[in-house]
Structures are given as C-alpha cells and as structure tokens.
Amino acid sequence: MMCGGTSATQPATAETQAIADKVKSQLEEKENKKFPVFKALEFKSQLVAGKNYFIKVQVDEDDFVHIRVFESLPHENKPVALTSYQTNKGRHDELTYF
C-alpha cells in the first residue's frame, strides 16, 4: 500500500473490531440512537500522517454503516476518532473512500 492510497478491501480482524468498538459511542451520539449490533465485516486502510480505516459495520440485521476512523501516529498518544460515516448501507455496498 502506498502512502495516500487505500488498501484493497479485507475481511475485518479482531483489531478492526476493536477500533470500531472504540468509536461506537461517538457514532451513537451523532445518530442519537443505540445500535443493537456493531460488527465490523470488512475494511480498507489508508496511510496518511497516521492511518485512516474505512470499516463496514453491521448495526442491525439488514442495516449497515460505513465509518471512517483516524488513528494518529503512536508518539502522538491520541485516541482513535470517528471522522466521517455513511448510513443506510447494504451488505453488498462497496466500501469506498469518503
């Protein structure tokens, strides 16, 4: 993966789920609702001055959200942050840069 470009879509890992879990409350606050399910299914990543993660998350049986999470460089010691998201996505919607 080159700096600035996004990786290929990959199946979510335990690390991806942990990153998604860290921003779940931020998304719930922005959407003003609780998600009964919050399961990371797949992701792309992008190297910047840190790393962006684009994660497809299942939030209900047939409801999906695409989230963009920023992870700063380790020496900055900052928490991961939800920087953008897209709602009303389906299981087969392609995960793209947003």
Swiss-Prot record:
InterPro entries: Cystatin_dom, Cystatin_sf, Prot_inh_cystat_CS, Prot_inh_stefin. It comes from the Eukaryota. The record marks 4 as: Reactive site. The modification N-acetylmethionine is found at residue 1. Pfam families: Cystatin. It is found in: Cytoplasm. Keywords: Acetylation, Cytoplasm, Protease inhibitor, Thiol protease inhibitor. Disulfide bonds: none annotated. The keyword Secreted does not apply. PROSITE patterns: CYSTATIN. A motif (Secondary area of contact) lies at residues 46-50. One of its GO terms (cellular component) is cytosol. GO terms for molecular function: cysteine-type endopeptidase inhibitor activity. Able to form dimers stabilized by noncovalent forces. This is an intracellular thiol proteinase inhibitor. Belongs to the cystatin family. This is Cystatin-B. It comes from Bos taurus (Bovine). The gene is CSTB.
